[in-house]
């Protein structure tokens, strides 16, 4: 492997996965070598969004059209994504981070250990405060859970205290953060977490 850390980013449609990648690329690229793989079923919309935002040079972003279930493309048959990651690692070695964004999926989404070293799962407050207690691999087993769009809590009647309590119960000590990626809340904490996971940076 010619990248130090492959990071999977998953979560339901509209939760903020692409916004997370945009934010992380902009905050990390001055100090680290980064590349990104995005997944969409029939288009390369997320890749084009990141390219148009100029978060990285165009060659460092690859869009994968999965043509089917987002979960299958990151778990059962991850060959398309694996090939895209290897392509980027061969083109831009050595890389510090390769981010792999799954297409929008449900709470059962999880990455193959052959594809990524760790996973981030993103949910958002607008789906309701019951989401953390519904469980699923994304909630309970991801290496980092993000509860995004906390600014919408009052508008959708979501109780952040309930979400906090349920998340702490479901996560059993695993890290998680409240975030508002549009204003930068939580970005520093996410960045520190990722930096701590780089093999050479671990104590």
Swiss-Prot record:
Chaperone keyword on record: yes
Single GO cellular component term: cytoplasm
Positions with a binding annotation for GTP: 11-18
Protein origin, superkingdom: Bacteria
Keywords, sorted A to Z: Chaperone, Cytoplasm, GTP-binding, Nickel insertion, Nucleotide-binding
Record-linked InterPro entries: CobW/HypB/UreG_nucleotide-bd, P-loop_NTPase, UreG
GO biological-process terms attached to the record: urea catabolic process
Alphabetized GO MF terms: GTP binding; GTPase activity; nickel cation binding
Coiled coil: none
Compartments where located: Cytoplasm
Known function: Facilitates the functional incorporation of the urease nickel metallocenter. This process requires GTP hydrolysis, probably effectuated by UreG.
Assembly information from the UniProt record: Homodimer. UreD, UreF and UreG form a complex that acts as a GTP-hydrolysis-dependent molecular chaperone, activating the urease apoprotein by helping to assemble the nickel containing metallocenter of UreC. The UreE protein probably delivers the nickel.
Family as reported in the entry's similarity comment: Belongs to the SIMIBI class G3E GTPase family. UreG subfamily.
Alphabetized PANTHER family for the sequence: UREASE ACCESSORY PROTEIN G
Protein name: Urease accessory protein UreG
Organism placement in taxonomy: Bacteria, Bacillati, Cyanobacteriota, Cyanophyceae, Synechococcales
């Amino acid at each position: 492997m010619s990248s130090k850390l492959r990071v999977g980013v998953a979560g339901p449609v509209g939760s903020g996965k692409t916004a997370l990648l945009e934010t992380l690329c902009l905050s990390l690229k001055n100090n680290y070598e980064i590349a990104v793989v995005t997944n969409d079923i029939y288009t390369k919309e997320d890749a084009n969004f990141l390219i148009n935002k100029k978060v990285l040079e165009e060659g460092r972003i690859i869009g994968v059209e999965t043509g089917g279930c987002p979960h299958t493309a990151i778990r059962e048959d991850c060959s398309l994504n694996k090939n895209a990651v290897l392509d980027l690692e061969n083109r831009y070695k050595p890389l510090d981070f390769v981010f792999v964004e799954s297409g929008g999926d449900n709470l059962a989404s999880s990455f193959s250990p052959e594809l990524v070293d760790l996973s981030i799962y993103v949910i958002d407050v607008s789906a309701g405060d019951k989401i953390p207690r519904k469980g699923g691999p994304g909630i309970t087993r991801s290496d980092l859970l993000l509860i995004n769009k906390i600014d919408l809590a009052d508008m959708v009647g979501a109780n952040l205290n309930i979400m906090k309590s349920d998340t702490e119960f479901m996560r059993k000590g695993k890290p998680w953060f409240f975030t508002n990626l549009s204003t930068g809340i939580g970005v520093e904490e996410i960045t520190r977490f990722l930096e701590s996971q780089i093999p050479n940076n671990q104590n």
